[in-house]
Amino acid sequence: MIKVAILGYGNIGKAAEQAIQKASDMELAGIYHHNDSLEDIQADVVLVCTPTREIRHYANLLLAKGICTIDSFDIHTEIYSHMQALKPIAMQHGAVSIVSAGWDPGTDSLIRTIMLAMTPEGQTYTNFGPGRSMGHTVAAKAIQGVKDAVSITIPIGGGKHQRDVYIQLEEGEDLQTVQQRIISDDYFAHDPINVIAVDSVLPFDTHNHGVLIQREGVASGISDQQLSFAMTINNPALTAQIMVSCARAAIRMKASQQYGAFTTIHIPPIYFVPLDEEQAIKILV
């Protein structure tokens, strides 16, 4: 049995607990909060379910113990540097770190990779939402002057998005000042954004989200190949399930001495599922 611990017990951590309990090849090795000591942690792999900007600190501590880590780091422009930062310590201590292991980045990254292999020439559009972005919501809540927040992603076509950020202001704070702080954050720097002050964010809070990935391309010199993938999901539930599947993959990689830090596109898909080679080929191929 794979011993899996959870670090961080928010929406993703709670969903991960359920996913681990339903996995036939895993057992829950503990639930840890941000301020808990990790000195005596006993686990094969830890799901780091903390806010993105806290992940590297905890991952470094765990990898130094030879414990594999899974995270859902979601700042797309920083994924490569995040992976490279964790790689040396993982390799030094014989561990595996799978980064950005959610649905996007994560499994959507696999879809985009497969679409590129199918149509080497073309254009891919990833359209998120409408739905609540967990990463952007956490980032908005951390802004000075924000008491509570919800960030909703609105697709506007062609892989472009608008962010509607509903905020409850701290007493005495000015909307324009707080809005400028939000717009200046890396999470929000790349999309049009509306910051809306409300008395309560509860009417706008939801776990629903979705994606439509479309590619128009050329296969074997023939154009007008139309590829698409769509899903509507519960955000924390799916993110947690993917992290649990990546925990399985990390242990299989460690067993074959493939140490280091990786994204989902580095990993053989067969490693994600609780099947042996024969079962996987008979069922999936």
Residue ranges and their predicted role:
Residues T107-N127, H136-A139:
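Rossmann-like NAD(P)H-binding beta-loop-alpha module
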